[in-house]
């Protein structure tokens, strides 16, 4: 019994061991993956749970599910340790073909199932990939179609071209080709020039579901092409900038090297052991000086270097550049007629080594004198009266001779103005006249003409009379117009702004007495350079006499408030017109302004006196403007000279003959406007200076415009509607077409009886107040009512001889 139990237990143990062994064999993980190239091959893959030798342990059986089909066997291969692949050869497939598959191992069947080739198509990889570069500016890739032309998928494929850099595969470009032709063309400039690229291609079926084929064998090439201009421009600019920088650095270091070799060897005063001696400081005005800080900031190193080489040229030019901004601020605008220049001496420095002679070069430079307007000139004139007093004028005479002459001349006219207003100047001028020595044997005749009425001009004879006077000398007067000869000087530009009130009859009487006193005194009569007489010896110079007069009467008298000379003259003309309105042909019309003065000129230009019996020609009598010597050249006759800066008086040979009669001078006057228009006189009219620098033809022009030659006038609003006013194109002066000009006055001069000879000369007259006047009467004339007209000082003071 025991034996039977033991046998049963042994059988059960064997069964259990067999079951365990059978259950521990190969196991398939999931369904296999099968695809077909749709030509002649189908492929299946299996994933196993353990490492298996596919060719020895597994076997695949397949057959087409069709009648009378046979079984086919495929031996799998290991694609990996746990993957088995089996490629099955099939007939040319069609869309309806289906295959039955069974996977067997040594122990039994592992898997079974069906597969349809049209459900999963994987085309084969393309081949024969080539690159063509003969296309202009493009690359051409070509490959072969994996399907034959009779295949259904020959025209149903999609191609993908991958182009990547050989050195960096991550940088690539993909082109999809959907057309049937197996080629791709793309521009060469889409790729970077100078880089090696690699290309490959794969295909996909469009007619059946499937997957991408494997990549075709790749090809490589070197991409190179010429860059366009826009792409080459940044590179060219960069290279150019680098080249320019290198060139500049090369030049800079070369110049520095040359400077050390050549420039630094030039001797300079800064490194010289010689001693510098300053001979004379720069004499410039306050506005031309600058602080050392400004000079140091504005000076440049290269200018300093050039100044060392060319001191006389570049140093002046640098100085002008420094002074031009400040001069433009301080100096007002100046017309071309007012341009004045004065010399200024530049400082000189001499290097004085031992036993070495160094020559001194004197450099002169011209600076433009500042011109002030009328208001500033009036303020400076008032300040000049105080600064030129005897206690303040001591230091002024230590300056240059030109400054002394300008100050003395200005103080002289200030003294004349004070004498006109306060009566002190008459005695001073008498004293100064007495100081002038007169040479024996010479007779000096001076005529001072002033308007004493609205229709006549009175002439007074001062000085010594000829030894044999003619009784017919003063028989009558004839009015003669003399053209103006005007000279410009900045020192006398504002004297007409000062005018004195109209003198009363008592003052006129005192003035006539003073004139008589002046007739008795001896006058200085310089010798005419054309005469053959001996020259006159002067005890004292003209400047010393003038300086003594300034010191004696500089502070005497008080000047009244300045008024307009033109306004006083218009009032005087109106007053004369109201008094003489009843006399026809004598008094001016009732008009105002320039028309009244024009009527005064026309009335005074007519001869009112008749010559007595026995005269030679014309009105007869003494003619002061006629030269008895016919061959002597005429001299210029400047008017409005204030008794200054005239030519040498003629010799006794040039005096007037006794049978001539003095003629009244009809002066051509212009009215002073708001702006002073001055121009230098013509060269033939400027008197020749004599003595020192003071005789420079200082003549003031306040009435006549030198640009157009007409009398200055300014019409009021009521006159604009009555008289046709014409504006001169040169200066803008308004003048009447009927008003006289310089040319008209010259014609009037010829038409008056007793024509003035061209050899008439003007001599130096005594310094008398400009409003001193007298009434000249002839024996054959009836008294004509006259009235002294108040005229601004400096506008009507005329002396002739």
UniProtKB/Swiss-Prot annotation:
PROSITE patterns: FN3, HEMATOPO_REC_S_F1. GO terms for biological process: cytokine-mediated signaling pathway; defense response to protozoan; immune response; immunoglobulin mediated immune response; interleukin-4-mediated signaling pathway; negative regulation of T-helper 1 cell differentiation; positive regulation of chemokine production; positive regulation of cold-induced thermogenesis. This is Interleukin-4 receptor subunit alpha. The modification Phosphotyrosine is found at residues 492, 566, 594, 622. A motif (ITIM motif) lies at residues 698-703. Residues 439-549 are annotated as: Required for IRS1 activation and IL4-induced cell growth. Residues 257-801 are cytoplasmic. The modification Phosphoserine is found at residue 164. The functional IL4 receptor is formed by initial binding of IL4 to IL4R. Subsequent recruitment to the complex of the common gamma chain, in immune cells, creates a type I receptor and, in non-immune cells, of IL13RA1 forms a type II receptor. IL4R can also interact with the IL13/IL13RA1 complex to form a similar type II receptor. Interacts with PIK3C3. Interacts with the SH2-containing phosphatases, PTPN6/SHIP1, PTPN11/SHIP2 and INPP5D/SHIP. Interacts with JAK1 through a Box 1-containing region; inhibited by SOCS5. Interacts with SOCS5; inhibits IL4 signaling. Interacts with JAK3. Keywords: Cell membrane, Disulfide bond, Glycoprotein, Membrane, Phosphoprotein, Receptor, Secreted, Signal, Transmembrane, Transmembrane helix. The WSXWS motif appears to be necessary for proper protein folding and thereby efficient intracellular transport and cell-surface receptor binding. SUPFAM superfamilies: Fibronectin type III (SSF49265). Residues 125-223 form the Fibronectin type-III domain. The keyword Transmembrane helix applies. One of its GO terms (cellular component) is receptor complex. Receptor for both interleukin 4 and interleukin 13. Couples to the JAK1/2/3-STAT6 pathway. The IL4 response is involved in promoting Th2 differentiation. The IL4/IL13 responses are involved in regulating IgE production and, chemokine and mucus production at sites of allergic inflammation. In certain cell types, can signal through activation of insulin receptor substrates, IRS1/IRS2. Isoform 2 (soluble form) inhibits IL4-induced spleen cell proliferation. Residues 26-232 are extracellular. The keyword Membrane applies. Residues 424-476, 493-515, 767-801 are annotated as: Disordered. Residues 549-644 are annotated as: Required for IL4-induced gene expression. Isoform 2 is expressed in kidney, spleen, lung and liver. It comes from Rattus norvegicus. A motif (WSXWS motif) lies at residues 212-216. Pfam families: IL4Ra_N. Coiled coil: none annotated.
